């Protein structure tokens, strides 16, 4: 059994491109939220870091956290060698920065399929595509905690989340930005799909959305704490968990095959009876 104190910060940041002075306001808000907390894990949402990250350097954040703290935040980084852009999650502690680049990108949002044929959409989608990440889907925070990083709608693709490298991870951390949905059902549907992953994998999930609904979910899909939609919120929660894996994690493909064969058998049995 392990214990962690977690702080979720839901910035409710606007989607539009911010001017330089507004970027500084967002950065100051981030630093204040970090500085006021003694939580072990301080987690922000997807693309909450307001500046383009050219090198993995976050000196202002590292200067204000203690040795037992890790800040997790989403941002856009660029690789100067390949001139590629990535939608990334960063895990920042006092001495080290780890990153995960999003693997499953949103078509027409993060990249333009068949760009040569759809060039007329560039005014909406932009002239530059994001690139698919190549990192292993696992981040270790010292010896105490390992987590599976999931960015935005990647949480839907359960068969791409867990593998032989990360199946023994302690928790999943899903950062997202559902601001695009406004006040419609999208954020709640996204939360519901995240809850499914918790019980399937028998692992707790910490979900942090820019505008909500953010939540701390246990391995049985119970919501332990959550935010309201379209609010700035800070949630602190003392989190206790036990490392377990479900049968689904170990035998997901076998179980699917078994269920498929079961229904096929019923189908042919009924047809034979009708004859």
Go through each PLM region and give its residues.
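Soluble catalytic regions of membrane-associated enzymes that act on cell-envelope
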Residues: 1-108, 138-145, 149, 153-155
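CN hydrolase (nitrilase-like) catalytic-core segments centered on the catalytic cysteine
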Residues: 41-73, 126, 144-234
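Short Pro/Gly-enriched beta-strand edge/turn motifs at strand-loop
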Residues: 70-75, 117-123
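Short beta-strand scaffold segments in enzyme catalytic cores
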Residues: 87-91, 137-139, 213-217, 235-237
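Catalytic beta-strand/loop cores that center a nucleophilic Ser/Cys/Thr
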Residues: 125-141
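Juxtamembrane/start-of-transmembrane alpha-helix segments at the extracytoplasmic/lumenal side
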Residues: 240-260
